[in-house]
Design a protein with these regions (language model features):
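Hydrophobic structural elements of the Rossmann-like NAD(P)H-binding subdomain
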Residues: 14, 56-59, 69, 115, ...
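Active-site loop immediately N-terminal to the catalytic Tyr-X3-Lys motif
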Residues: 23-29, 51-52, 90, 95, ...
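Short C-terminal tail/terminal secondary-structure segment
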Residues: 23, 103, 114-133
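Residue(s) in the substrate-gating loop at a strand-loop-helix junction
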Residues: 18
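Active-site helix of classical SDR
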Residues: 34, 42
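A glycine/serine/threonine-rich, flexible loop-to-helix segment
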Residues: 51, 63-86, 127-133
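Alpha-helical segment proximal to the catalytic Tyr-Lys
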Residues: 3, 47-51, 111
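C-terminal helical subdomain
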Residues: 58, 78-109, 113, 120-122
């Protein structure tokens, strides 16, 4: 994709990361590492492509109300309560909120943004709370 964007004069790439690309949670180490790799890939690509007119950013969602979240992390009332405890906005994110962020980053309105990992997590990373080890 990047090669074609360079040939045509520019574009925008938006990678999907996660707040777990920044956190270290021993029970999901491989997921943490893979999302952390996406963050670094985003930054390296942004530096390598900036002068060619290609912007590269990533979106790092927190817990979003999806079927996957329902099956993987929202498995009980207790699990939901733990998620809310570490989310200052006290609600799950909606898929449309992630889509809107991606659309913004891909748009001309974000033409001076590259190399950023945009966290959309209801304030979780600001709280700086992770799960007990």
């Amino acid at each position: 994709v990047a090669r074609e964007m360079v040939k045509t004069g520019g574009g925008s790439i938006v990678n999907m990361s996660s707040v777990n690309g920044t956190l270290a949670i021993p029970t999901i180490a491989s997921y943490n590492v893979s999302k952390g790799g996406i963050n670094q890939l985003t930054r390296v690509m942004a530096l390598g492509l900036a002068d060619k007119g290609v912007r590269v950013n990533a979106v790092a969602p927190g817990t979003i109300a999806t079927e996957l979240a329902a099956k993987a992390v929202l498995t009980s009332d207790e699990a939901k309560a733990k998620i809310m405890m570490r989310t200052p906005m006290k609600r799950l994110g909606e898929p449309t909120e992630i889509a809107d962020t991606v659309a913004y980053l891909a748009s001309d309105a974000a033409s001076y943004i590259t190399g950023e990992i945009v966290v959309v997590d209801g304030g979780r990373m600001t709280l700086n709370y992770t799960v007990p080890v």
